[in-house]
Design a protein with these regions (language model features):
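Fe-S-dependent hydro-lyases/dehydratases of central metabolism
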Residues: 1-635
Length: 635
């Protein structure tokens, strides 16, 4: 029975038609923080308690009322004129959506729900889409607003230079729609009109997740079937959807395609994977974040996993998020988390024995330091898991648990957008201005369309050291990119690896090494990689000249002659565009009259160099205007 995967084949198929009722949570992009507020992070592992923080009390009452008005129909949470789930993967966010709008996983397990339906005019953020799959949910790209055109077919432009949108069909709260899962179409209530193609939401793999109640069941089901078949000495029955293989003979490989081909598991010899292929890949580095860590622990316990996968090069449990609010709840939860993860086989930011001092550096900064191969795949429990070496994917707590337990992950090879630079950066400009200018120039080159969304940003800045490259790659999370890759030259990569070695050595000197010798192993791997580069055996990762890209963006550095500011356009006539960071302006736009209500320097996307710049600005101001007084709680 197990060798035939009857545990899966005997499950009921998903419904042919799903009747849904819409609930618009907000206009514009919806952050996962709306579904699971960061301020309530301490309760994420307690689903009943954390569920009370979902959106607002008012929204919860409206959702309950819709359920009563439409018995037998499922609710669909919508980001009107925006993207659903930006900012992070946030497993607790999709858990909350499922709790309020999904279906109970088992009558014997309270507050654990699955199968939520979420949607956005511009689809689902890539990092959140994975989390939707974990719960066997459906993520719908509505496309219900389109560019308005004049009689000549040209886009009509808004007061901020972006295209004016017009409504193609309504999804106002309380609208009844039908999802045809066989035809993969979104229909009006009586099924007479096709509103949108939703085939992206119903790939063969996604349908399996829906049928099984989540992606983990499929991952472990496959392992169970293979184990049973090997035990019996028979071939496993072909039950699960075959992995999609996209291969174009004669076509070169982008950087991410090279990394995936290097790390792919179970691919027939000689098969080359291009964008669109489904791949099981070996993971090199895994990071667990401290506010989602308790949920990762729950997942590991549910998997009966007791020790870290031996195929991983490195794994780290951070203590950064709770460090800034070291309250009673954090003090109660964090030591237990560190003790579990340390015993499981991770290097931990806090010492369960209390010997070495706490290392509260931001998780992605540490992961950047312990990544010692430009061909590595990194999985991290934080949306800003973006490295200057290798390719890194932010992931939900469950995917992190899978990577820790199995040392592998299922990922579709993403398309890439190539970003190159021309001209020279002025001496008085900061690299942050290049980051902002990239966004502004990309939007200008593609008529306001964000071509980065859901794709890899392949950045060609060969001489950029790890910390600067990290500033760029970290920002790509804000542009809804799937991930990013920095293409270095040989000398720069060697220098970045030497920096990584020195920082790992500091961790060893502090006493953070674990019995497996993981940190020393990373230094040894860095030495090996440096030797490969110096000998010419394996130079720094580069794409092939004949690689195919979804788009190419050229950033003109000569155009950047003054600081750039990302400033929400709160007066935009389109409500959905008032609170996004897509409006980039030069500082001269404000004429020196911009009022600043609050200043904060210290996000995960800055480093000490940025703080030095701010300090110098204040010194200059003090020289001109006298002493500056601070009135901030964290200074």
């Amino acid at each position: 029975s197990y060798a035939d995967a009857e545990f899966f084949t005997k499950l009921p198929e998903i419904e042919d038609k799903i009747d849904v009722v819409t609930y618009v949570a907000a206009e514009g992009d919806i952050s996962t923080d709306l579904m699971s507020p960061g301020a309530e992070a301490h309760s994420r592992a307690d689903r009943e308690l954390h569920g009370k923080s979902f959106i607002s009390e008012k929204a919860q009452k409206e959702i309950q009322a819709l359920k009563l008005q439409h018995p037998g129909k499922r609710l669909m949470l919508i980001a009107e004129k925006g993207t659903m789930g930006v900012g992070s993967s946030r497993m607790s966010g999709i858990n909350n959506v499922a709790l309020w709008m999904g279906e109970q996983a088992s009558p014997y397990v309270p507050f654990v729900n699955i199968a939520p339906i979420v949607a956005g005019t511009n689809g689902i953020s890539p990092i959140f889409q994975t989390t939707v799959g974990v719960t066997g949910g459906i993520g719908v790209d509505l496309k219900n607003w389109v560019k308005k055109v004049d009689s000549d077919g040209n886009a009509i432009i808004n007061n901020d230079g972006s295209p004016v949108l017009e409504e193609k069909y309504s999804v106002a709260t309380g609208t009844t729609l039908t999802i045809d899962t066989k035809a993969k179409k979104l229909l009006n209530e009586d099924g007479t009109e096709e509103l949108a193609d939703v085939s992206k939401a119903f790939s063969p793999q996604s349908i399996e997740f829906m049928k099984a109640g989540g992606s983990y069941a499929i991952d472990f089901g496959k392992k169970l079937q293979i184990f049973a078949a090997e035990t019996l000495g028979v071939e496993p029955k072909p039950v699960f959807a075959p992995a999609k293989v996209v291969s174009h003979p004669g076509q070169g490989l982008t950087a991410v395609e090279k990394i995936f081909n290097n790390n792919a598991v179970g691919v027939p010899e000689g098969t080359v994977l291009h964008a669109g292929s489904d791949a099981m890949v070996k993971v090199n580095i895994v990071g667990s974040q401290d506010t989602t860590g308790p949920m990762t622990v729950q997942e590991l316990e549910a998997m009966a996993a007791t020790v870290i996968s031996p195929v991983l090069d490195g794994a780290y449990q951070s203590g950064c998020h709770t460090a800034s609010v070291w309250d009673n709840k954090a003090q109660a939860n964090t030591p237990k988390l560190m003790a579990f993860m340390n015993k499981f086989g991770l290097v931990t930011g806090r010492d369960p024995k209390g010997v070495y001092p706490a290392m509260t550096d931001v998780i992605h900064k540490v992961l950047n330091d312990i990544t010692v191969d430009d061909r590595a795949i990194i999985i991290g429990g934080d949306s800003h898991t973006r490295m200057s070496k290798g390719v890194a994917f932010g992931a939900d707590s469950g995917t992190v648990a899978l990577a820790l337990a199995l040392g592998m992950a299922n990922i579709t090879v993403p398309e890439s957008v190539k970003v190159t630079f021309k001209g020279k950066m002025a001496d008085h400009m900061d690299f942050r201005d290049v980051v902002h200018a990239t966004q502004a120039q990309m939007l200008a080159q593609f008529d306001g369309e964000n071509v980065f969304q859901g794709r890899i940003i392949e950045v060609h800045i060969g001489t950029l050291l790890a910390d600067q490259a990290f500033t760029f790659t970290d920002w790509t999370a804000e542009m809804k990119a799937k991930a990013s890759i920095c293409i270095s030259n040989n000398e720069t990569l060697i220098e970045s690896l030497e920096i990584a070695k020195s920082r790992i050595q500091i961790m060893i000197d502090k006493g953070m090494e674990i019995p497996s010798g993981m940190l020393q192993g990373l230094i040894d791997k860095a030495d090996k990689r440096i030797a490969q580069i110096r000998s010419g055996e394996q130079p720094a990762l580069r794409p092939d000249d004949n690689a195919k890209y979804h788009a190419e963006v050229v950033v003109d550095l000569d155009q950047i002659n003054e600081p750039m500011i990302a400033d929400p356009d709160v007066n935009n006539i389109d409500v959905a565009k008032r609170y996004t960071h897509d409006t980039i302006r030069p500082i001269s736009y404000y004429g020196g009259n911009k009022k600043v209500d609050l200043g904060f320097v210290g996000s995960c996307m800055v480093h000490k160099g940025d703080l030095n710049i701010v300090a110098q600005m204040f010194r200059n101001l003090e020289k001109a205007n006298g002493k500056i007084e601070f009135n901030a709680p964290l200074v």
